[in-house]
Curated annotation (Swiss-Prot):
Coiled coil: none
Recorded superkingdom: Bacteria
GO BP of this protein: negative regulation of translational elongation
Record's protein name: Ribosome hibernation promotion factor
Originating organism: Staphylococcus aureus (strain COL)
HAMAP family: HPF
Keywords recorded for this protein, A-Z: Cytoplasm, Translation regulation
InterPro entries hit by this protein: HPF/YfiA_ribosome-assoc, HPF_long/plastid, RHF-like, RHF/RaiA, Ribosom_S30AE_C, Ribosom_S30AE_C_sf
Function description: Required for dimerization of active 70S ribosomes into 100S ribosomes in stationary phase; 100S ribosomes are translationally inactive and sometimes present during exponential growth.
Gene Ontology MF terms: ribosomal small subunit binding
A GO CC annotation given for this chain: cytosolic small ribosomal subunit
Quaternary structure and interacting proteins, as annotated: Interacts with 100S ribosomes.
CDD domains for the chain: RaiA
Length: 190
C-alpha cells in the first residue's frame, strides 16, 4: 500500500486536496503484482502569482519514481503529475519484462520502500573562501547493470546516476553527455 506524506509550502493541505492526491497517485498500485509498501513524498508549493509546484517522489526497492509539475491550477497539476508517474512505471516495467524474457528469468517487478535520508546543511556559516556544500543526500546503492542505471537516471530526470555495477561489483557512474549520448565511469581501488 502506498502511504502519503503531503506537505504544503504557503498552502494549507485541505482534506479535499489530500483526498484528490491520494486518489490519483494511489492508482499507481494497479501496475504492481504485489502492492508495494511505500511512502509517497508529496510537496505542494504556491507562489505569489497563484502558480503551484507539485513534487512527488516515491522511493521503491528497484526504482525511484519522481515527477515535478508547475501549473496555475493545482488539480490540473496533480493530474499531469499522475500521468508522468504512470508513464515512468509503464516504461520501467516494459524494460524489466523485456530483460527478464531475454535472460529467461521469471523476475517479478516487486517494489518496496528503500531507506532514503536527506539532510540540509546549515547555511549560516557562509565564507567566500570556503567551498560550501548546500545539500547533502545519503542513499543506498543498488546493484544493476549500466542499462538499468541509465533508465533510472532518466526516470529521475538527472544528468548522472551512481550505482553498484553487477558485472564488476564496483561503484560506477552513468552520465548524460552534451551530445545527448551516455558515458560510464567505472571506479577502482588503489
Amino acid at each position: 500500500m502506498i502511504r502519503f506524506e503531503i506537505h504544503g509550502d504557503n498552502l494549507t493541505i485541505t482534506d479535499a486536496i489530500r483526498n484528490y492526491i491520494e486518489e490519483k497517485i494511489g492508482k499507481l498500485e494497479r501496475y504492481f503484482n504485489d502492492v508495494p509498501n511505500a511512502v509517497a513524498h508529496v510537496k505542494v508549493k504556491t507562489y505569489s502569482n497563484s502558480a503551484t509546484k507539485i513534487e512527488v517522489t516515491i522511493p521503491l526497492k528497484n526504482v525511484t519514481l519522481r515527477a515535478e509539475e508547475r501549473n496555475d491550477d493545482l488539480y490540473a497539476g496533480i493530474d499531469l503529475i499522475n500521468n508522468k508517474l504512470e508513464r515512468q512505471v509503464r516504461k520501467y516495467k516494459t524494460r524489466i519484462n523485456r530483460k527478464s524474457r531475454d535472460r529467461g528469468d521469471q523476475e517479478v517487478f516487486v517494489a518496496e520502500l528503500q531507506e532514503m535520508q536527506e539532510t540540509q546543511v546549515d547555511n549560516d556559516a557562509y565564507d567566500d573562501n570556503e567551498i560550501e556544500i548546500i545539500r547533502s543526500k545519503e542513499f543506498s546503492l543498488k546493484p544493476m547493470d549500466s542499462e538499468e542505471a541509465v533508465l533510472q537516471m532518466n526516470l529521475l530526470g538527472h544528468d548522472f546516476f551512481v550505482f553498484i555495477d553487477r558485472e564488476t561489483d564496483g561503484t560506477s557512474i552513468v552520465y548524460r553527455r552534451k551530445d545527448g549520448k551516455y558515458g560510464l565511469i567505472q571506479t577502482s581501488e588503489q
